[in-house]
Amino acid sequence: MRVLLQRCYEASVSVEEEVISEIAGGLCLLVGFTHTDTPETVDYMAKKIVGLRIFEDESEKMNISLADRGGAILSVSQFTLYADVSKGKRPSFTKSAPGEKAEALYDLFNQKLADSGIIVETGVFGAMMDVKIVNHGPITIMLDSDEMRSK
């Protein structure tokens, strides 16, 4: 599982030029799944994200998590996070989980985030979406469950 996390002042997602979800501040997550991801992977990543200390305290040190300060998450599915561009000029997406599996894991991931007390807004799984993000920092972090668990 890969999540591109972006701390933001605001974020929104539109489908066919209609805003379907938006947040006033917190985190925008672009979320992708691969074949080996499981519900346990989703649980691990949700807990990691909610607890990441990426907001500044009064000393301007990143020491506060979203769970500590409040805020919201805009979660957007993005199979292209598993693009393989090692051969040729066209990306291959064979490392991305099949749609049915990815959608089930995406729904579970969003539920786990919401269960932690965070407001979660989402895009539309599988849709062509326009995502607008006003980054704060900018703070952008790539989380890869395979890399994180191997350490």
UniProtKB/Swiss-Prot annotation:
Gene3D superfamilies: D-tyrosyl-tRNA(Tyr) deacylase. It is an enzyme of class 3 (hydrolase). GO terms for molecular function: D-tyrosyl-tRNA(Tyr) deacylase activity; Gly-tRNA(Ala) deacylase activity; Ser(Gly)-tRNA(Ala) hydrolase activity; tRNA binding. It is found in: Cytoplasm. It catalyses: glycyl-tRNA(Ala) + H2O = tRNA(Ala) + glycine + H(+); a D-aminoacyl-tRNA + H2O = a tRNA + a D-alpha-amino acid + H(+). An aminoacyl-tRNA editing enzyme that deacylates mischarged D-aminoacyl-tRNAs. Also deacylates mischarged glycyl-tRNA(Ala), protecting cells against glycine mischarging by AlaRS. Acts via tRNA-based rather than protein-based catalysis; rejects L-amino acids rather than detecting D-amino acids in the active site. By recycling D-aminoacyl-tRNA to D-amino acids and free tRNA molecules, this enzyme counteracts the toxicity associated with the formation of D-aminoacyl-tRNA entities in vivo and helps enforce protein L-homochirality. Signal peptide: none annotated. The lineage of its organism: Bacteria, Bacillati, Bacillota, Bacilli, Bacillales. Keywords: Cytoplasm, Hydrolase, RNA-binding, tRNA-binding. Its EC number is 3.1.1.96. One of its GO terms (biological process) is D-amino acid catabolic process. A Gly-cisPro motif from one monomer fits into the active site of the other monomer to allow specific chiral rejection of L-amino acids. Its main location: cytoplasm. GO terms for cellular component: cytoplasm. It holds the Pfam family Tyr_Deacylase. Homodimer. Belongs to the DTD family. A motif (Gly-cisPro motif, important for rejection of L-amino acids) lies at residues 137-138. This is D-aminoacyl-tRNA deacylase. SUPFAM superfamilies: DTD-like.
